[in-house]
Amino acid sequence: MAFTNVCLWTLLAFMLTWTVFYVTNRGKKATQLADAVVEEREDGATDVIIVGAGVGGSALAYALAKDGRRVHVIERDLREPERIMGEFMQPGGRLMLSKLGLEDCLEGIDAQKATGMTVYKDGKEAVASFPVDNNNFPFDPSARSFHNGRFVQRLRQKASSLPNVRLEEGTVKSLIEEKGVIKGVTYKNSAGEETTALAPLTVVCDGCYSNLRRSLNDNNAEVLSYQVGFISKNCQLEEPEKLKLIMSKPSFTMLYQISSTDVRCVFEVLPNNIPSISNGEMATFVKNTIAPQVPLKLRKIFLKGIDEGEHIKAMPTKKMTATLSEKKGVILLGDAFNMRHPAIASGMMVLLSDILILRRLLQPLSNLGNAQKISQVIKSFYDIRKPMSATVNTLGNAFSQVLVASTDEAKEAMRQGCYDYLSSGGFRTSGMMALLGGMNPRPISLIYHLCAITLSSIGHLLSPFPSPLRIWHSLRLFGLAMKMLVPHLKAEGVSQMLFPVNAAAYSKSYMAATAL
């Protein structure tokens, strides 16, 4: 019995000694870590690493640097990019840009003013303009179209002009991770040397082809179609302030002025039948299939780029629901985080909105090294962004589906109903254009207009009298509309889509006239 007591007391003494040692040692480590953070601040260490210096990376670098953060931006290629997307800034995007102090980046690049669009279908045309009497939108209700590369270079120049921004050309190979926390990146610099960069916060903003996303979550992008584009040079559209949307086959065609002398021509092809660009099949397809559907007054300009041998580029259109990473110390942004069909040209607008939100949430934090607080910021960011992102994601993906031509009577009725709705004028046109332009980021308003288009299309389908076949097609049309909407209700969240309180809070914080 005595031996047993001795063993128990010995074990208890050992446990107490170990506990005291553990707590003391842990306290020392915490103190050392805090001292290291202070030392890093004193030594001019980086606060934030941004992977990618496109629109998002450059804008975020500028915003965070203006708040006193020391930012290291690593971009694979600092030459002026050539893209066929990211060339149209909606009114809502311009508002976000101005709130970030970057509106002047649209100056000096020959950007063109756009006040709406002209829609063409089956020989008819209708003008749909951004509403000028929207009292809830505190900014000039016009868009801008431009060469994407020129805009990106202006953003890079503006960001790198700040002394606490380091813009470096390099290829990021991987993220540095310790116990579920991202500490920085490993990258190859312009000299070909592999090196590391460390910071308490890493932002991955490297676009739709992100090679870092798969190490943060298992989110995969779905390819929807391909957008094919080229430039017709030394010409100007009739009414250049209106984007031209042609409801052609197999899908839509667009023309818009991206400089005083250049017109972007772009059309969509479905993924199961893409003509080859390299062997000339695509140019033949443009001349024989797409061009005859372009209105005569636009056709000469449309064909000019092909006839002059301008380079044709094709880009996949993708969609991907936003998903948070479980790893700490890292944030995904832009197309690396969330994608939708680019039919409504609103990707940059969502991205700039995200940057505004993230900047505001980070401003109260004096030290970004607290991974727990950063995780809370990211969760809040994910919820706050929903009114804008859910509206744009749902509208972009739904609108692109409606624009695809079909021999199916129900689908074609929906397509015709969309054209009729946009061309009807009044609150229908102004309401839809406010949504398209990011002037009214309210999911419930979008649902209202989608339901109105559906009911209008059903009414058109049932006239002049509801035969059994027409009733059947109407039911199918309603089913198609639900297939467009329900997946987004699930993906974005029913409460975020249906309850207006979140949208009201977003509008008050991020759509007001006052700067952030």
From Swiss-Prot:
The chain crosses the membrane at residues 3-23, 45-65, 446-466. It is found in: Membrane. Coiled coil: none annotated. Its cofactor is FAD. GO terms for biological process: sterol biosynthetic process. It catalyses: squalene + reduced [NADPH--hemoprotein reductase] + O2 = (S)-2,3-epoxysqualene + oxidized [NADPH--hemoprotein reductase] + H2O + H(+). It is a multi-pass membrane protein. FAD binds at residues 55-56, 75-76, 83, 88, 156, 172, 335, 348. The keyword Transmembrane helix applies. Pathway: Terpene metabolism; lanosterol biosynthesis; lanosterol from farnesyl diphosphate: step 2/3. One of its GO terms (molecular function) is squalene monooxygenase activity. It comes from the Eukaryota. Keywords: FAD, Flavoprotein, Membrane, Oxidoreductase, Transmembrane, Transmembrane helix. Expressed in seedlings, leaves, stems and inflorescences. Detected in siliques. Its EC number is 1.14.14.17. One of its GO terms (cellular component) is membrane. InterPro entries: FAD-dep_OxRdtase (IPR006076), FAD/NAD-bd_sf (IPR036188), Squalene_epoxidase (IPR013698), Squalene_monox (IPR040125). SEQ4 or SEQ5 are unable to complement seq1 mutants. Belongs to the squalene monooxygenase family. Catalyzes the stereospecific oxidation of squalene to (S)-2,3-epoxysqualene, and is considered to be a rate-limiting enzyme in steroid biosynthesis. PANTHER family: SQUALENE EPOXIDASE 5-RELATED, SQUALENE MONOOXYGENASE. This is Squalene epoxidase 5. It comes from Arabidopsis thaliana (Mouse-ear cress). The lineage of its organism: Eukaryota, Viridiplantae, Streptophyta, Embryophyta, Tracheophyta.
